[in-house]
Amino acid sequence: MKIYEQHKTDKDHIATPRYVVEDIYNLIDIDSFKSIWFPFNNYDSEFKLRADELNLKYKATHIFDDLGNDFFTTEPPANCDLMISNPPFSNQNEIIERSFRLIKENKIKSFALL
């Protein structure tokens, strides 16, 4: 069993419904972003699935996966102009801190966390 499948039932894992992702994408004009990072949305995430349908350029990773990705050490894609995701709440303070650090280091231009 993959690590993701083991953690999918954790109380910290709450999948974002498709209609919410569609509304967010419309509100922020998702097509205007050229390099997007979904740091908590690999596998079956609606963020990723909808991005595929829209042919968006993105990098999708997850805080727990079988590829060794970890939000706190994984680098965003080059020229990342948007990092967007619904991260686990148990790490919210650390996630917000790193998000602002990534902006300060010019590794991402903007972020949106649910």
Residues covered by each model-derived region:
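Short, conserved loop/helix-junction motifs that constitute active-site signature segments
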Residues: 31, 101-106
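S-adenosyl-L-methionine
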Residues: 1-56, 60
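A short helix->loop->beta-strand "cap" motif at the edges of active sites that frequently abuts
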Residues: 56, 105-109
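Conserved proline-anchored active-site loop of SAM-dependent methyltransferases
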Residues: 24, 35-51, 60-63, 70-100, ...
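Poly-acidic low-complexity segments
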Residues: 17, 29, 64-72
